[in-house]
From Swiss-Prot:
It is found in: Endoplasmic reticulum membrane. It comes from Drosophila virilis. The chain crosses the membrane at residues 43-63, 98-118, 125-145, 171-191, 211-231, 232-252, 294-314, 405-425, 432-452, 470-490. Belongs to the glycosyltransferase 58 family. It comes from the Eukaryota. The gene is l(2)not. Keywords: Developmental protein, Endoplasmic reticulum, Glycosyltransferase, Membrane, Transferase, Transmembrane, Transmembrane helix, Tumor suppressor. Its EC number is 2.4.1.258. Its main location: endoplasmic reticulum. It is a multi-pass membrane protein. This is Dolichyl-P-Man:Man5GlcNAc2-PP-dolichol alpha-1,3-mannosyltransferase Alg3. One of its GO terms (biological process) is protein glycosylation. Residues 64-97, 146-170, 315-404, 453-469 are lumenal.
Length: 526
């Protein structure tokens, strides 16, 4: 009995995937690719996916294994229950921890959570909802870092995975700060995508959840003016204001003064026992109005000091975006032309090869042709490889310019403006850490300091926020880190301004030299 003719087929099928696995192993399982993932900001799209997946696992483990701590959740539910029962007087909406002090968007969002969690009793479900909020915010934050290509991926990995306080704030405390920060980062992403109206809506909603989002307002105003001009800026500010009136309407119609005093109380006194940054002050000095006015004056002074760099950065960002809008269509057109030319060339080459093949076939006898084909098939079966064919469609190099790093010019002023507000705050409570946590790596990498100093700043800040209760030493260390970080960013920013001024001066000198030289050359020619 003749042996079966299909003995070699399984061999060829096994070798194809093994070859593919070898190629993947050679390309990705090596030290160079690991270094690329760790240190190259261009690898952030890949690393971001890994971070989000790992964070999902970490949050589930924290929820399952670490006990929940009740602080404000019940009070939030009690305040919302009063609203749902028909009370629109803010002075009457209270919980176990005190009166309601947040704007109307907070009331609506937590009223939704009130229903979803069975009047606030299903805390475990609320924890998983806040875990989703955390993951969604991480996606928005990582998108900004991916666009800017400023910070190495390993820094974001370390900062995300090593902060117990941040995970605690989101899934073990259920504060309203995460909701406000989520809307804030959604607004920043929309602004950078030039979706101004949606960005303004998200920003206004964030302010409607918690008033600390106003710390970004000075930078946002300049960003509006630099990109939109005065009239369109007024339109966006009107959108923000109208949305605040709309969400506050049930309270403004009935008890307007109580709503404004309760939700936008700029003079509210914080309790000294919860302060993270001013433990070294006495309670009397901490609560003095003069001390608050000094901090406000310092805040405004620092904003004025950085107003010119902020405006310069925003204008430079706008100019680069305009260049992008001019160049990108040209690049796309050039690439399409190349592709069309490549297709035409490939078609001509294919016709030429077929013509040559026909000429060669005419010179061979039928017996020779069959012998060559049989020999080729036997080689394919023994090696598991296909016959080599001429590469008619070789991949053409395409033109491309990556413009997204220009978002560095927009992000730094936003993060810096918020950081100044946090550093000059009358008091910082533990949940306020998320106000600037996700921007700290960006700010630290915007300083001229060495890597060791950068790690030290991030490490000490994390230590200060994890010290409970706060001590004199931890509060002083936090202020020192804020000061060192602010000085470093200022050095970086003003160095860029000096370089910019030098380049402009050189350009003016070159232009004046050319203008002065033109009459002389014309006289010589005459």
């Amino acid at each position: 009995m003749a042996p079966p003719r299909t003995n070699n087929r399984p061999v060829t099928r096994r070798k194809k995937p093994s070859n593919l696995l070898l190629l993947l192993k050679e390309k990705y399982v090596n030290w160079n690719f690991i270094k690329y993932l760790a240190f190259e900001p261009a690898a952030l799209p890949i690393v971001s996916v890994l971070i989000v997946l790992a964070e999902a696992v970490i949050n589930v483990l924290v929820i399952q294994r670490v006990p929940y701590t009740e602080i404000d959740w019940k009070a939030y539910m009690q305040e919302c229950e009063g609203f749902l029962n028909g009370t629109t007087n803010y002075s009457l909406l209270r919980g176990d921890t005190g009166p309601l002090v947040y704007p109307a968007a907070f009331v609506y969002i937590y009223s939704g959570l009130y229903y979803l969690t069975g009047q606030g009793t299903n805390v475990r479900l609320a924890q998983y909802i806040f875990a989703c909020i955390y993951l969604l915010q991480m996606c928005l934050v990582l998108r900004l870092y991916t666009k800017s290509r400023k910070v190495p991926p390993y820094v974001l990995v370390l900062s995300a995975f090593t902060s117990y306080r941040i995970h605690s704030i989101y899934v073990l405390r259920l504060f309203n700060d995460p909701v406000a920060i989520l809307l804030l980062y959604a607004a920043l992403n929309l602004f950078l995508d030039q979706r101004w109206t949606l960005g303004s809506i998200c920003y206004s909603l964030a302010v409607g959840v918690k008033m600390n989002i106003l710390l970004f307002a000075p930078a946002l105003l300049l960003f509006y003016l630099a990109n939109l001009g005065v009239l369109r800026t007024l339109v966006q500010l009107t959108i923000c204001a109208v949305l605040q009136l709309f969400i506050g309407a049930p309270f403004l119609r009935t008890h307007p003064m109580e709503y404004l005093r309760g939700s936008f109380d700029l003079g509210r006194i914080f309790e000294h026992k919860w302060t993270v940054n001013y433990r070294f002050l006495s309670k009397e000095l901490f609560e003095q109005r003069e001390f608050h006015l000094v901090l406000l004056a310092l805040h405004l002074l620092l904003l004025l000091c950085f107003a010119k760099p902020t405006w310069t950065f925003f204008r430079s960002y706008l100019r680069l975006r305009e260049v992008q809008q001019q160049i990108v269509p040209q690049i796309l057109h050039k690439n399409r032309e190349q592709q069309n030319q490549a297709k035409i060339q490939a078609k001509k080459s294919k016709q030429l090869v077929e013509q040559q093949q026909e000429e060669e076939d005419e010179q061979l006898s039928a017996e020779q042709k069959s012998f060559l084909k049989a020999f080729e098939r036997s080689l394919q079966q023994s090696t598991g490889q296909k016959s080599l064919e001429p590469h008619l469609n070789q991949k053409q190099e395409q033109y491309d310019i990556y413009f997204e790093p220009c978002t560095q010019l927009a992000l730094l002023p936003f993060f810096l403006c918020n950081f100044i507000g946090v550093a000059c705050a009358r008091s910082l409570h533990y949940q306020f850490y998320i106000w600037y946590f996700h921007s700290l790596p960006y700010l630290v990498w915007s300083t001229p300091y060495s890597l060791g100093v950068r790690y030290l700043i991030l490490g000490i800040i994390e230590y200060c926020w994890n010290t409970y209760p706060s001590t004199m030493e931890s509060s002083i260390a936090l202020h020192l880190c804020h000061l060192i970080l602010l000085v470093g960013v200022a050095r970086h920013v003003y160095r860029i301004l000096r370089l910019n001024a030098t380049v402009k001066q050189q350009q003016r000198q070159e232009q004046s030299t050319l203008q002065n030289g033109q009459p002389k050359t014309s006289k010589k020619s005459q």
